[in-house]
Curated annotation (Swiss-Prot):
HAMAP family: Ribosomal_bL32
Organism: Streptococcus pneumoniae serotype 2 (strain D39 / NCTC 7466)
Keywords: Ribonucleoprotein, Ribosomal protein
Protein name: Large ribosomal subunit protein bL32
SUPFAM superfamilies in the cross-refs: Zn-binding ribosomal proteins
PANTHER family: 50S RIBOSOMAL PROTEIN L32 (PTHR35534), LARGE RIBOSOMAL SUBUNIT PROTEIN BL32 (PTHR35534:SF1)
A biological process term (GO) from this entry: translation
Family: Belongs to the bacterial ribosomal protein bL32 family.
Taxonomic superkingdom: Bacteria
Xref: NCBIfam families: rpmF_bact (TIGR01031)
GO CC annotation, single: large ribosomal subunit
Gene Ontology molecular functions: structural constituent of ribosome
Keyword flag Nucleotidyltransferase: no
Amino acid sequence: MAVPARRTSKAKKNKRRTHYKVTAPSVNFDETTGDYSRSHRVSLKGYYKGRKIAKAASAE
């Protein structure tokens, strides 16, 4: 099994990890329901692309 010849410094490690960033989720306005929902997902009221495709989840 391969073993690193030298220890990776904190600076080298952090430079490598600069690309691991958290991005904000994309949110779209649904004109049918008047709510905001994430792209390519069913809204909380059961609409997708303006059509009703699922029953709305009830708060029990």
